[in-house]
Amino acid sequence: MTRSALQMGRLTLVLCLLLQLVLVTQACFLGNCLNDGERDVDGREAMRPCKYCSFGQCVGPQICCGDRGCEMGSEEANKCREEDEDSTPCQVFGWPCTLNNPGNTNGKCVANCIGICCVTDTCVVSSECQKESKSGIRVGCQRS
């Protein structure tokens, strides 16, 4: 074999390996696939609403929040552990808020009347969640 034929063979081998690498990385991994094994073309996971608890929605495995506040570790809040059994992630309703929580700073405002911002493992009172309408009444709260 000539020297140029060897170089062409190596170049072809390198190109084939690069193509194979690209095809393998396009595979369906656990974190970016829907239940039927198809890759989500937008790169987003399918979402469903989080389960409801006695007076609001499940925010984490042991956190139930609604307009009257949040319960953590109570019997009712422990029903939220069922969320962990479902492989499809759920979406907590509420506008975004920021927590000073290492590794998980993107929370949701879940108790508008009180102004509580939660992530899956903790909640804090946040002025960011006490949004008011133009009339000065907190959004989602009833006048008493």
Curated annotation (Swiss-Prot):
It is found in: Secreted. SUPFAM superfamilies: Neurophysin II. Residues 37-44, 131-144 form a propeptide. Keywords: Amidation, Disulfide bond, Secreted, Signal, Toxin. The modification Aspartic acid 1-amide is found at D36. Pfam families: Hormone_5. GO terms for cellular component: extracellular space; secretory granule. Residues 1-27 form the signal peptide. GO terms for molecular function: neurohypophyseal hormone activity; toxin activity. Expressed by the venom duct. Belongs to the vasopressin/oxytocin family. The cysteine framework is C-C. This is Conopressin-conophysin.
